[in-house]
Amino acid sequence: MEARPLATPEEAWRIASSLRYRHIEGTVVAVVQDVETKEVLMVGHMDPIAVVLTLTTGLAHYYSTTRKRIWLKGETSGHYQIVKEFRSDCDGDAVVIKVVQIGAACHTGSRSCFESKYSLIKALKLSLRHG
């Protein structure tokens, strides 16, 4: 599957400029969802440049708050995210990106960063144990 731009550079900058970068290090929160299954794959951060690169290349880019730089998802692993849809919330401080995930989305090698189930019962048992 081939990535295609979702916007021209001018449109991408207009979209990026309309967002409110009020989270960690001047970013918006990016919730990434599988376009077919609707499964939440991961949550990342995007600064204006990551938004523009994502929209103009059709490949998901994020701002790494630990490495302090833009990164292309899959640049080292080959597990790219081909962007099919990009939406912002009503406040403009979060986006949902619907993607075709190539390989694993999580750095642990799992398809999703949300594969571990933590139930209320487990939480209660832990609470009772540690009292």
UniProtKB/Swiss-Prot annotation:
Which InterPro entries does this UniProt record tie to the protein? PRA-CH (IPR026660), PRib_AMP_CycHydrolase_dom (IPR002496), PRib_AMP_CycHydrolase_sf (IPR038019)
- In its UniProt entry, the species of origin is given as Pyrobaculum aerophilum (strain ATCC 51768 / DSM 7523 / JCM 9630 / CIP 104966 / NBRC 100827 / IM2)
Name the chemical reaction catalysed here.
1-(5-phospho-beta-D-ribosyl)-5'-AMP + H2O = 1-(5-phospho-beta-D-ribosyl)-5-[(5-phospho-beta-D-ribosylamino)methylideneamino]imidazole-4-carboxamide
Sites binding Zn(2+) sit at: 90, 106, 113
User: What keywords does the record list, in alphabetical order?
Assistant: Amino-acid biosynthesis, Cytoplasm, Histidine biosynthesis, Hydrolase, Magnesium, Metal-binding, Zinc
HAMAP family to which the protein is assigned, alphabetical? HisI
UniProt protein name:
Phosphoribosyl-AMP cyclohydrolase
Subcellular location per the Swiss-Prot or TrEMBL entry? Cytoplasm
The record lists Mg(2+) as bound by 89, 91, 93
Q: Report the top EC class in one word.
A: hydrolase
Cofactor binding: number and manner:
Binds 1 Mg(2+) ion per subunit.
The pathway is: Amino-acid biosynthesis; L-histidine biosynthesis; L-histidine from 5-phospho-alpha-D-ribose 1-diphosphate: step 3/9
Q: Name one GO biological process term.
A: L-histidine biosynthetic process
Is the Amino-acid biosynthesis keyword given for this protein?
Answer: yes
Annotated function: Catalyzes the hydrolysis of the adenine ring of phosphoribosyl-AMP.
- Name the needed cofactors: Mg(2+); Zn(2+)
Select a single GO molecular function from the record's annotations and give it.
phosphoribosyl-AMP cyclohydrolase activity
Q: Which domain of life is it from?
A: Archaea
Q: How does it assemble?
A: Homodimer.
